[in-house]
Amino acid sequence: MTRGRFITLEGLEGAGKSTALTRVREYLQRQGIDAVMTREPGGTPLGERIRALLLGQSEPPMAPATEALLMFAARSEHLDKRIWPALERGQWVVCDRFTDASYAYQGWGRGLGAERIAALEDWTQGALRPDLTLWLDVPVETGLARAAGRGEAPDRFEQERDGFFERVHEGYAALAERFPERIRRVDAGQPLEAVLTALEEALASAVTRWLSGTEAH
């Protein structure tokens, strides 16, 4: 059986990933593609408990290395229990954030550096990398204003200062420059419908290639 495709969505707080995830699901359904929708951190019962630890308040503050290791602990469980089984069944997997977020948030944002994240990535994932990453690129100020406008209590990350998110944004930009074939930038500072149109165009381009057999895993 042919392994399923692995698609990830990335972006800062307020980038619109939840809405984008719905559009991706709807597009794949129209193509008759069986897709599993999931998220990180989380995606499994244990992963969701780790998510609560990561997003909840921590006093004294959680150490950056602890944060990174918890992210990869949740990811390891997610891969073992949900992502790999689905891919091996031939299902496609669409994940709200994956390891690019660890590079951006812990590698750049927390200052741990890409080398440490890469070591955890190789150990946890082996050779598995997403086939396509849709990066919803939103200016920091715009994203944080949108997140604040949801009217929900901010989580531990959303309470960070703007400088943290500027570093995270720099991380995503560096990754997009390094992996231009995999990471497709979508300007998420546009009006919503324009964002979703651009997102679907980037997705459709990749899906068309895959379904035509012109691009192997």
From Swiss-Prot:
UniProt record, GO biological process: dTDP biosynthetic process; dTTP biosynthetic process; dUDP biosynthetic process
Residues that bind ATP: G11, L12, E13, G14, A15, G16, K17, S18
Entry GO MF terms: ATP binding; dTMP kinase activity
Gene this protein is translated from: tmk
Reaction(s) this enzyme catalyzes, per UniProt: dTMP + ATP = dTDP + ADP
Cellular component, GO, one term: cytosol
Signal sequence residues: none
Function: Phosphorylation of dTMP to form dTDP in both de novo and salvage pathways of dTTP synthesis.
Lineage of source species: Bacteria, Pseudomonadati, Pseudomonadota, Gammaproteobacteria, Chromatiales
Official protein name in the record: Thymidylate kinase
